[in-house]
Amino acid sequence: MVVRSNGWRPAPGSGLWMMDRRQALKSMAAATGCVMAAAVGCGGGGQTTTPPTTPTPPSLPVGVFNPTSADLSFLDALEQQGCLYFWEQASPVTGQVLDHAANNLSGQIDPSTTQASIAATGFGLTALCIADQRGYLTGATHTQIVARVQTTLSFHLNNMQNKNGFFYHFNDVNTGAPLSGSEVSSIDTAWLMCGVLAARAYFNDATITSLATQLYERVNWPWMLNGGQTFAQAWYPSTAANPGFSSSRYDTYCELMALYLLAIGSPTYPIAATYWVNIARPTLTYEGYTYISSNSDPLFTHQWSHAWFDFRTNSDAYTNYFTNSIYATQAHETFCLMTYPNWYTESYWGITSSDYVGGYTAWGGPPEQGPIDGTVVPCAAAGSLAFLPNECLEVLEALKSNWGAKAWGRYGFVDAFNSNSSPKWYNTDCLGIDLGISVLMAENVRTGLVWSTFMSNPEPGSAMQLAGFH
């Protein structure tokens, strides 16, 4: 059985959903060729530490992005078909977006699953802003798009189960009822709120503004701290095997920046800006690239917060996180080409948490992690389009050109495929979160629309200022 989105898998024979993304990451050991420095921050609880020096730039600067008309046509296709997923694979009654769906459908919502994801819905709300701006949904008017956003926000505010404003990760797409085994998720609520705020700023509609503001201001961020120095990853209801807050914390640098900044910027339930320094920030050196990175996190951890928060020209006491993600992407490309030269080339590289022939895995590097087998995950390159546009676009265009007959469908790329295996393997599904990061970063590298829209809300900029960005 293929494991679905974001580290969750169905427990064999139980019908329950189990979280294994972070468990998988924690179990992966460091490989040779990487040097991990001591954590920077106060993640262990209040130590005084010295911020790292700014990473040394590589010898070759990042190139200027001057896309050709063919490049723009490709990006249009990637964005338009990705946006179509968030229109067709969402319930018109609840607005929830399916976590995953087959990539060979003809316009109907996938009948084989009812699993919606609040993270996919957050990406979807943002994708609808892009779709409206570019006129991508030829079968939907602006009025219809606004109505869908209103429906989505209203249903989440008034009909979805929540705990102090935090939502269950996976819910029934038709009813909103939490799926058995699902957790109340801190980070996935953050992705939903990013989409909520993006929609509030973009549509400038009184109903959307009211609903979005109520949703964001209802989240009781301090509650998810559970008295600790960092956020708990989840809370489980009394029906779970281990009810209450999870012992796992968002205490080390990863995709967590959006979570902390949304909490710091909250006008109703803020956390103190001092929690920003409680995050441990280990540094990794690989082949001359030095950057902040956990010892076991895939490439998406350097991408997702950047889809909404604009870190390009701002640094805090530790680093410029946009530059940090450039180095992380360069290191990942180098890792693929140097470690597996028989599989990966300059036009075929990029792995991050995804489905694969054996189910689901959180894989990547450096350091090497997971059962790397020559599979490529298109959203790894797509999610880094804003960081290395030329290199990533080369990969994406080649993937479509060379393997598009099976790797590209109604909504763009399938989640992953392996052109090196015998027989070749192609996933038949696409995942909402992976299409989402691809669409958002493609638009950001072209126009910066998501950045400028999201950052026009007062809360993100205020949070960054409070956290010490300048």
Task: Describe the function of each predicted region.
Residues 49-59:
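Intrinsically disordered, low-complexity proline-rich regions
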Residues 60-470:
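Ser/Thr/Asn(+Pro)-rich, low-complexity disordered segments
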Residues 43-49:
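Bacterial lipoprotein signal-peptidase II cleavage site
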Residues 1-40:
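N-terminal secretory signal peptides
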